[in-house]
């Protein structure tokens, strides 16, 4: 169902189970934004639960596609729904729509993660993805996570930045010269 989540749940679960069978050690799914924006939260939660079951013991990242959700309240509701339905990580974006990862979305999602942790004692990971192109932008997301969720979140198991360009930029910024090792 990537990137739009617009396929049947049977296809989504079959794809997930096949990926796990073929060796995937993590699974991603995209929130059914159409159902969510229509107020059909039950369908959204049911889909996440079924995909989580197909993941076996592997972590599930639920992509909220925050740019399509359009408001802080929708982002928070989607984050809470995803966590209670079984997400191990919540992720900002597929990177396939114009508005991808934003600091506002990161702030709202991290606040929801903190509230969820305070209520349940369960750590949920956060991944900023889509449109992060510079070291400075990555540092901004790092700062949001550190300030809201604390130092315990600044590790691979709980915080990630997804980008196709950033690794080379970071190495170049550290070394002070243009390099392309990745």
Model-derived segments and spans:
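Alpha/beta enzyme core
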Residues: 1-126, 133-164, 168, 172-182
